Amino acid sequence: MLVSIVVPVYNEEENIAIFYNAVTKVMSGLSYEYELIYVDDGSTDSSVVILREIAKLDARVKVVLLARNFGHQTALTCGLDYAKGDAVITMDGDMQHPPALIPELIRLWENGYDVVRTIRDSTEDASWAKSFTSKYYYKLMNKMADVPIVEGGSDFRLMNRKSLE
């Protein structure tokens, strides 16, 4: 079975090698084939050069280049379109989403979950103003939305092929 890992990138030249090494280390301990799909969202630094070099050395790495900066969600959606895996993991390449959690996402998928999402459980790095604003944003959105929005949700998740189609 194939696991796709989709990673939007925007001016992440300092993090790309660190992230790549962390993901390959984690995935080498698992029994799945994988592809690592980087979607560059119009970076203006050396991100594209670094990504292309990694892709030359590792056939599992795919690089998708957007013509300009379309935004994080568009880059994620584009990566999902390219992903071929039986399971697809989306995560940020700046190490905010720890690759060490990938085995747990896969374990839950193996146990029958179609979608496994992560939730930030700590805002200790956030300022008082950001925490306050975030808390009331979710309260307001949940009053207006038909579907509950979970506080602390993130793009770090696993989805099976069925849930993507």
PLM feature spans:
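Cell-envelope/extracellular polymer assembly enzymes that use nucleotide-activated donors
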Residues: L2-S4, E35
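Short, well-formed alpha-helical segments that are part of the catalytic scaffolds
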Residues: E12-M27
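Acceptor/aglycone-binding surface of glycosyltransferases and processive sugar-polymer synthases
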Residues: E53, V64-R68, H72-Y82, A87, ...
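A conserved acidic beta->alpha catalytic loop
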Residues: D40-V48, M95-Q96
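Acidic helix N-cap motif at the loop->helix transition within catalytic regions
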Residues: E14-I18, T44-I54
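Short helix-capping segments at alpha-helix termini
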Residues: M27-Y32, A55-R60
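Short beta-strand/loop segment that forms part of the nucleotide-sugar
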Residues: Y32-G42, V64-L65
